Amino acid sequence: MPILRPLVIASLVLLVSNACADGVPNDCTQLILAIAPTWNSLRGELRLFERSGGGQWARVAGPFPVLFGKNGLAWGTGVAGQNEPGLRKQERDGRAPAGIFEIGQIFGYDPRLPPGGDYPYHQVTEADVWSDDPRSPNYNRHIVIDPKKPPDNYTHEKMRSGDFAYQWLVEIRHNSDPPVPGAGSAIFFHIRRGVNRPTTGCTTMAKENLVRMITWLRVKGHPCYALLPAVEYDRKWRSWNLPPPETLNRSSGAHAQP
């Protein structure tokens, strides 16, 4: 028995560390938080939060309206959410990935970010592609190709399509490390196409709100995105290190519904 005790203690420590692994990382001081009324909601509210070190979250912008997938939400794969039971995000399911995700690079048509922007940025050309083909070794990756020899899916994978909604693309790092074929790809923040036009999995908003977010982002803030239906936010905000409910000033439609 004395010999087994250290093993038992070590196992308990491992279990505790795993239980605490999910949630906003300690080095994240910029948080984008979106809440949907239900799993099947097409729309919700988004807020921007900041904190110093491990301090309390303070709301710096929002709420403002956003649109999600045309079929609602499903659990994604990122910093947190991948270990939750329930419906999983799949390619072309029309659902936005729920959970917590790191923010990747910003892509866009313009030579540089909007005034005030200071974040890794790549101006896309006709050579820039984001693969959504689960059969491709480059699935859910940004790649640069020879436009004279485009891949089979080039017409819908090219990032400079001329679509005004893609003027700015802020990468949401779902299913990224490494990508699992078929688990969902090309998830971004971008400009909405209309107030009643949900997406196939991205989170969209009015242009002025997207620009506000882009100019706020900083690499040193290790920004993350948390997207949850209200019932999951109410269950997890404390254990996932999210802003407490009293900081949200939620509208009635953003509360958990039975």
What are these model-predicted stretches?
Residues 6-15:
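Bacterial N-terminal signal peptides
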Residues 1-5:
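Positively charged n-region of N-terminal signal peptides that target proteins for export
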Residues 22-199, 208-258:
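Cell wall/extracellular polymer interaction/catalysis modules
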Residues 205:
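A conserved hydrophobic position in a structured secondary element of the catalytic/binding core
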Residues 17-21:
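Sec/Tat signal peptide C-region and signal peptidase I cleavage site
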Residues 202:
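Short cysteine clusters
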